């Protein structure tokens, strides 16, 4: 089993980074990721936790000796389950390969959290992958694991560059996006208040009409009761 670890900083606040994460693919640099399909989304803890399950399709060059040995293709699928926790301000993404998993198993964990040195403006990215090859020939398994670690390192560099490009575009539109969202919220609140006013006015008028109707229908009874008292 081989272990790959990686970490770096993003010069953007956690809110922006985690929002841009859903726009990470496709990008012009991480071309090995060709499709991302959402399988499931679920809100928990009164809307404070978002769980997302995705299927990621990857296409990249594979050495001929691996292709010959495994009899596979250069296309692979990865299952990813992510959890966004607004209370803890954390995004945790866990994934494992579905293709040729009986011969090579890759478990990856990625976390995004506010940077401990500058939580308001920076985000800490941490990545860990456990890579295990299965086979009777230990030397061949080691070679496969070493190649996988090298490929992870290459893809990590591409991923950082690609996500930086996405974040730059996203950041330029972030303020406008927040302003638009705020305007929509204010507009919705105003519409709701107007609806409440209209409903209250209608209810008041209806109550007044009902009161007049009751008086009109029972005027003789009220008159007799008044005369009786006098």
Swiss-Prot record:
It is a peripheral membrane protein. Its main location: mitochondrion. GO terms for biological process: cardiolipin metabolic process; cristae formation; negative regulation of phosphatidylcholine biosynthetic process; phosphatidylethanolamine metabolic process; phospholipid transport. One of its GO terms (cellular component) is mitochondrial inner membrane. Pfam families: PRELI. GO terms for molecular function: phosphatidic acid transfer activity. InterPro entries: PRELI/MSF1_dom, Slowmo/Ups. Keywords: Membrane, Mitochondrion, Mitochondrion inner membrane. Disruption phenotype: Defects in mitochondrial morphology. Residues 1-175 form the PRELI/MSF1 domain. It is found in: Mitochondrion inner membrane; Mitochondrion intermembrane space. Belongs to the slowmo family. Interacts with MDM35. Required for mitochondrial cristae morphogenesis and MGM1-processing. Controls the stability of mitochondrial phosphatidylethanolamine (PE). With UPS1, controls the level of cardiolipin in mitochondria. Cardiolipin is a unique phospholipid with four fatty acid chains and is present mainly in the mitochondrial inner membrane where it stabilizes the electron transport chain supercomplex between complexes III and IV through direct interaction of their subunits. Present with 2910 molecules/cell in log phase SD medium. This is Protein UPS2, mitochondrial. It comes from Saccharomyces cerevisiae (strain ATCC 204508 / S288c).
């Amino acid at each position: 089993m081989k272990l790959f670890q990686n970490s770096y900083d993003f010069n953007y606040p956690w809110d922006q980074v985690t929002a841009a994460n859903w726009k990470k693919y496709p990008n012009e640099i991480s071309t090995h990721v060709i499709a991302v399909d959402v399988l499931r989304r679920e809100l928990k803890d009164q809307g404070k936790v978002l769980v997302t399950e995705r299927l990621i399709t990857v296409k990249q060059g594979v050495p001929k000796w691996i292709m010959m040995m495994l009899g596979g293709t250069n296309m692979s699928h990865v299952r990813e389950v992510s959890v966004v926790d607004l209370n803890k301000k954390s995004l945790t993404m866990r994934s494992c390969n579905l293709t040729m998993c009986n011969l090579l198993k890759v478990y990856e964990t990625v976390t995004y959290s506010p940077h401990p040195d500058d939580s308001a403006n920076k985000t800490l990215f941490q990545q860990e992958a456990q890579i295990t090859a299965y086979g009777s020939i230990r030397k061949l398994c080691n070679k496969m694991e070493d190649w996988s670690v090298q490929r992870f390192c290459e893809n990590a560099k591409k991923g950082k560059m690609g996500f930086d490009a996405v974040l730059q575009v996203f950041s330029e539109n972030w303020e406008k996006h927040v302003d638009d969202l705020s305007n929509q919220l204010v507009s919705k609140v105003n519409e709701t208040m107007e609806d409440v006013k209209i409903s209250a006015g209608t209810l008041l008028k209806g109550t007044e009409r009902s009161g007049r109707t009751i008086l009109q229908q029972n005027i003789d009874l009220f008159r007799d009761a008044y005369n009786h008292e006098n």
